[in-house]
Amino acid sequence: MSIVVKNNIHWVGQRDWEVRDFHGTEYKTLRGSSYNSYLIREEKNVLIDTVDHKFSREFVQNLRNEIDLADIDYIVINHAEEDHAGALTELMAQIPDTPIYCTANAIDSINGHHHHPEWNFNVVKTGDTLDIGNGKQLIFVETPMLHWPDSMMTYLTGDAVLFSNDAFGQHYCDEHLFNDEVDQTELFEQCQRYYANILTPFSRLVTPKITEILGFNLPVDMIATSHGVVWRDNPTQIVELYLKWAADYQEDRITIFYDTMSNNTRMMADAIAQGIAETDPRVAVDRLSTRLQDAGFEMSLSLKAKWRPDQDALELCREHGREIARQWALAPLPQSTVNTVVKEETSATTTADLGPRMQCSVCQWIYDPAKGEPMQDVAPGTPWSEVPDNFLCPECSLGKDVFDELASEAK
């Protein structure tokens, strides 16, 4: 199977729907991944990279269906890790004399993985070119530590396609190949996760290397990555994002770290989060546990204990959250929250006007209509009668039917 990328460029890679761990177990690939290999058919036929070693046989068989292997004139290896060059041994067994173009560091890596120093290696450096006929050339650009010492990119003149290696990719498997064909929200979330996990340690190298590449003043109509989608619609948008992420990027976001045995500390953390959101609604508050589980961390079983914060303690937590939001704001706060007195003024609508507070009969958690439950999108000022039927007690996760009117407020 192959997919036309542009003109005489075909994708001949492999989709991996089932992979869930990458680089050990530290990077969870919940949407799988792909290993992108490209076949360029001009006067000279060029293969850009292979696929992961576990797909070696399928890859070579698929390639054989596209072209007589003996007609492959050059192999370009942008990166020597097994998810890029893993099928080399299987392929070179069929065409052992085919020239391989790569960096000097890549030769060491390839020999370390495949143990064939007799292969026909050709070292390339930044600015070196390879004529492939029909007026087209490959231009090589070394990109050490983005993200490996042997890394490089390859640019195809005429078609203006940049084969970018690991840069600008995502571990994102989809039946579609191009960026304009997939869900944009999910795509950019996966791009950011990929940058955070693969390239963040090398951020200080990203900006100068991208600047160097842009300095060649080469048009870029497409960016063909080693993993994930090919960027054909506004391809430089991902380049602009990389420059942004590399420049000490931070969002107006606060993460609350907490651990809890019986959900009491969680109640306090939620109250702090409520205070933050009251003061600066633009700030996103993430619960770390879900992110850690997404990253592959295991959570231990909890141990129940007695201590629970009362309403006064929770209000102290909310005020603490408000103060955090005021001190850490990256931009001027919305006018409606500048004066924290507004919080008290808006509570001119008294609890009595909103109806009684409700108490969970199982865990004793109290729903206060004046405060709502922002973590379930129940806004402050929502009477119990208007709370959605799918509401769950934040502490014991039981439904509305276990709630009774607070005894002290019962008529």
UniProtKB/Swiss-Prot annotation:
Quaternary organization: Homotetramer.
Organism phylogeny = Bacteria, Pseudomonadati, Pseudomonadota, Gammaproteobacteria, Enterobacterales
Signal peptide limits: none
Q: Name one GO molecular function term.
A: iron ion binding
Tell me which Gene3D superfamilies the record gives.
2.20.28.10, 3.40.50.360, Ribonuclease Z/Hydroxyacylglutathione hydrolase-like
Keyword list, A-Z: Cytoplasm, Electron transport, Iron, Metal-binding, Oxidoreductase, Transport
What name does this protein carry?
A: Anaerobic nitric oxide reductase flavorubredoxin homolog
For region Zinc metallo-hydrolase, the annotated ranges are 30-210
Keyword Electron transport, does the record have it?
yes
Q: Which residues bind Fe cation 3?
A: 360, 363, 393, 396
Primary location: cytoplasm
